[in-house]
Design a protein with these regions (language model features):
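Extracytoplasmic metal-acquisition and chelation regions
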Residues: 1-150
Length: 150
């Protein structure tokens, strides 16, 4: 919301004649985000386990804003996942009853197998969509489905 206010104010200064359109778009965006936030919180409240691990360094903001229980972050490349590291990953996920493992891309088959063996669910989120609000909505939906076991 706040960043949208700043951007809208800048746009009005650059294009004063478009002020009514800019303000209408800002109001629509804020309403969309408010509804999205309320819907997401309601869905989160029904999840039994909010523990996650991220194999990407892209999602700190998302994890924090949803108040998820972050067990760990390990953004190492697929080539650095040794058999011992994969065993440790599986153990960490099992020991901490991690519901969802987040990534910004499909990991290697070996990493997928380690996640599956632990009983956690892999959720691959988008990081480069053209529409950031739609991307956020889609990512949160995928994450909430993963947390609920859907």
């Amino acid at each position: 919301g706040r960043m949208a206010d700043v951007m809208a104010a800048d746009l009005v200064r650059l294009a004063p004649a478009d002020k009514p359109t800019i303000e209408a778009n800002l109001a629509a965006l804020k309403q969309r985000l408010l509804k999205f936030s309320a819907d997401s919180e309601a869905r989160l409240a029904s999840a039994d386990n909010l523990s996650v691990m991220s194999l990407s360094d892209h999602f700190g903001y998302l994890i924090g804003s949803l108040n998820l229980e972050l067990i760990g972050v390990d953004p190492r490349p697929d080539t650095e996942w040794t058999p011992e590291a994969l065993k440790q990953l599986t153990a960490t996920l099992k020991d901490n009853d991690v519901a969802v493992v987040m990534h910004h891309r499909q990991p290697s088959d070996a990493v997928k197998a380690a996640i599956a063996e632990s009983g956690s669910r892999l959720v691959v989120l988008s990081t480069d969509a053209a529409d950031p609000v739609a991307e956020l909505e889609g990512n949160v939906d995928l994450l909430l489905k993963g947390l609920s076991g859907a």
